[in-house]
């Protein structure tokens, strides 16, 4: 029996097996692999794949024929089929995946242009730069597997220098973010810095002016829009969910599969269990938008040890391992693991190293999730990983100080826990004394007490979908003005 709702899929095959889909993290079901018995024609096993991870195989695939339910660029929203004692057929309903639109950054001068979002990928970018900034941008796309030539947005008749960038489709390369520089005086974008998932950066134009960022974590750019006339005035982008950047399993890819997925921001802790030249199991403590998620035990542990990272200031960038080379048994397993980080640190070597080495890494990108196979017996047979390029932290934005002219008693403390962030500050200003008489802080978890006198705020320091990361203001023997520095939610300082 197959039971499906918006949050989970349940498959009943002698036992109750369930696979949950996290819609709050934009996870959706992309495909289903089903296995039917050649003699009874009943469905004997099933496996679900989302945009982040793959479920365990539910049932048994022995002496079965496999078929797949999938439509490129769409997600599954329902099922249909036939059953009696067994499920004999299975089909699915699909719908399109809505892209994410990031509004334009820069100025509002010029004429509006729109490339749209119904593309598979960006193919080629051309930018004509001049002394006063970028004169035009032209982007070619891949649509339904074919090249689609884009239009020129801006002034094609100006004098300048032409720069080009091509995206390598054969290596599944795609754009992950664009960093731009805008000059307020000329109302023109001065430079554009493009970054791909393969860590191939290209800078076009000049790093001059106010910096902005077009990025959507875990997504790829599939289209652009903006404003232009005699020059490029502003730029926005469309994003769709990217195929996970997956490093395939190293070792023996047989046994019981497991997949933690790739929808994490980073790894906080690593737990490895093993004795001698046998690694039994590995599990991880991840960070997911500030929430700590620890993967479950995959078996009873005997000698588990841990490696702690300084997250969010430190990431795993590579895993070095070794494999057993037994002469009498036609299998292998992992005998040792060593984790290396962005701070040039290495974990202790877990297990006992052999001469058969492997490495999981991708151009220094953070490894944000893992998958692998465990044997039915004791050992970890293979290990793979997911990696993700991390967009740069945008420039801190400064909100104007609130209060009075440029000319309480005791001390009170409001403490935040490590995963808590300030989202807004309320305050009251007294014109007679020229100072702030009350402050109240709000976080993503709670509100502070009222500091000072009064409970009716006369100003609020807040920006939607941003967190407060610093303060500024003016004071003498009292606080006259208070302002804040903000960053978009989800961005973290990484050294």
Curated annotation (Swiss-Prot):
SMART domains: Jacalin
GO MF terms held by the record: carbohydrate binding
UniProt keyword Repeat, yes or no: yes
Domain Jacalin-type lectin span(s) in chain numbering: 1-96, 99-241, 244-389, 403-488
A Pfam family annotated for this UniProt entry: Jacalin
InterPro entries linked to this entry: Jacalin-like_lectin_dom (IPR001229), Jacalin-like_lectin_dom_plant (IPR033734), Jacalin-like_lectin_dom_sf (IPR036404)
Domain of life of the source: Eukaryota
Assigned protein family: Belongs to the jacalin lectin family.
Protein name per its UniProtKB record: Jacalin-related lectin 43
Organism: Arabidopsis thaliana (Mouse-ear cress)
Lineage, broadest ranks: Eukaryota, Viridiplantae, Streptophyta, Embryophyta, Tracheophyta
């Amino acid at each position: 029996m197959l039971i499906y709702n918006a949050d989970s899929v349940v498959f009943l095959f002698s036992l109750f097996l369930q696979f949950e889909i996290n819609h709050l993290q934009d996870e959706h079901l992309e495909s289903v692999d089903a296995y039917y018995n050649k003699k009874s024609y009943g469905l004997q096993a099933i496996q679900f794949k989302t945009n982040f991870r793959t479920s365990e195989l539910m049932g048994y695939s022995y002496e079965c024929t496999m078929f797949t339910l999938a439509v490129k660029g769409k997600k599954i929203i329902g099922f249909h089929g036939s059953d009696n004692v067994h499920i004999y057929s299975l089909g699915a309903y699909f719908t399109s995946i809505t892209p994410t639109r990031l509004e334009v950054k820069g100025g509002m001068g010029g004429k509006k242009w729109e490339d749209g979002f119904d593309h598979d990928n960006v193919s080629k970018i051309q930018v004509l730069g001049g002394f006063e900034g970028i004169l035009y941008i032209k982007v070619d796309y891949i649509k339904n597997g074919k090249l689609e030539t884009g239009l020129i947005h801006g002034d094609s008749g100006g004098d300048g220098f032409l720069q080009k960038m091509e995206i390598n489709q054969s290596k599944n390369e795609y754009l992950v973010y664009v960093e731009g520089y805008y000059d307020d005086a000329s109302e023109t974008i001065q430079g554009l810095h493009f970054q791909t998932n393969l860590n191939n950066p290209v800078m076009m134009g000049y790093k001059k002016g106010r910096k902005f960022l077009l990025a959507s974590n875990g997504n790829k750019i599939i289209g652009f829009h903006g404003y232009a006339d005699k020059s490029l005035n502003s730029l926005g982008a469309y994003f769709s969910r990217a195929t996970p950047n997956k490093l395939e399993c190293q070792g023996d890819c047989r046994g019981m599969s497991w997949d933690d997925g790739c929808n994490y921001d980073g790894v906080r802790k690593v737990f490895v269990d093993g004795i001698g030249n046998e690694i039994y199991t590995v599990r991880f403590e991840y960070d997911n938008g500030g929430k700590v998620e620890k993967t479950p035990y995959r078996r009873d542990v005997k000698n588990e040890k841990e490696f702690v990272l300084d997250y969010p200031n430190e990431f795993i960038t590579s895993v070095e391992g070794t494999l057993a080379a037994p002469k009498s048994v036609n299998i292998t397993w992992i005998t040792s693991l060593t984790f290396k980080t962005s701070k040039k640190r290495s974990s202790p070597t877990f297990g006992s190293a052999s001469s058969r080495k492997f490495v999981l890494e991708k151009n220094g990108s953070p490894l944000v999730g893992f998958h692998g196979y465990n044997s039915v017996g004791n050992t970890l047979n293979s290990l793979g990983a997911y990696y993700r390029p991390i967009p740069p932290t945008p420039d801190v934005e400064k909100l104007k100080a609130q209060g009075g002219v440029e000319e309480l008693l005791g001390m009170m403390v409001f403490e935040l826990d490590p995963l808590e962030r300030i989202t807004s500050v309320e305050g009251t200003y007294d014109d007679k004394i020229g100072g702030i008489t009350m402050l109240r802080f709000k976080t993503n978890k709670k509100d502070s007490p009222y500091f000072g006198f009064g409970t009716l705020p006369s100003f609020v320091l807040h920006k939607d979908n941003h967190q407060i990361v610093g303060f500024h203001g003016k004071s003498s023997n009292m606080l006259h003005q208070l302002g804040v520095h903000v960053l978009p939610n989800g961005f973290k300082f990484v050294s």
